[in-house]
From Swiss-Prot:
Comment, domains: Small DNA polymerase formed from only a palm and a C-terminal subdomain. The total DNA-binding site of pol X is composed of two DNA-binding subsites.
Protein name: Repair DNA polymerase X
GO MF terms, alphabetically ordered: DNA binding; DNA-directed DNA polymerase activity; metal ion binding
Co-factor requirement: Mg(2+)
Length: 174
């Protein structure tokens, strides 16, 4: 367990130190492409882990980012890692914490932020209401009859309003 303040410190540290190796070169992940999600974004007082979403510009980049993740100046071990999710254990101030990294394409960003911010109970209610209208919402997009429904949105707030719900800041979601 770590406090919200510790979680924010870890995220601030990571924003300037996340990179991935590609063709023998270290590629820095820009701070603007790193989004805190999960209990940290909901500003819960105590956190089980730190969740970060990394926005990737192109689909072909997915296979390179997480499997080749590097953190400058921080000791870590990989528990499990794939193209879309990586679970790490990081050493921070003489303690070990879990860091969950997720990836999303730029066009998936609002959906992924909503999905990974949660909480699960809130997502279930939204998805149940959408299911009654034959829609499916996940971290990749909004679908009707298994076909992606293109929405002209760029933020999570726009997504919620487009779906016909009242936007609640993450801290107020139950």
């Amino acid at each position: 367990m770590l406090t919200l303040i510790q979680g924010k410190k870890i995220v601030n540290y990571l924003r300037s130190r996340l990179a991935f190796e590609y063709n023998g070169q270290l590629i820095k992940i820009l701070s603007k492409n790193i989004v805190a999600v999960g209990s940290l974004r909901r500003e819960e007082k105590m956190l089980n882990d730190v969740d970060l979403l990394i926005i990737v510009p192109e689909k072909k980049c997915l296979k390179h980012v997480l499997p080749n993740i590097r953190i400058k100046g921080l000791s870590f071990s990989v528990k499990v890692c794939g193209e879309r999710k990586c679970v790490l254990f990081i050493e921070w101030e003489k303690k070990t914490y879990q860091l969950d990294l997720f990836t999303a394409l730029a066009e998936e960003k609002p959906y992924a932020i909503f999905h990974f911010t949660g909480p699960v109970s809130y997502l279930i209610r939204i998805r149940a209401a959408l299911k009654k209208k034959n829609y499916k919402l996940n971290q990749y997009g909004l679908f009707k009859n298994q076909t992606l429904v293109p929405l002209k949105i760029t933020t999570e707030k726009e997504l919620i309003k487009e779906l016909g719900f009242t936007y609640r800041i993450p801290k107020k979601r139950l």
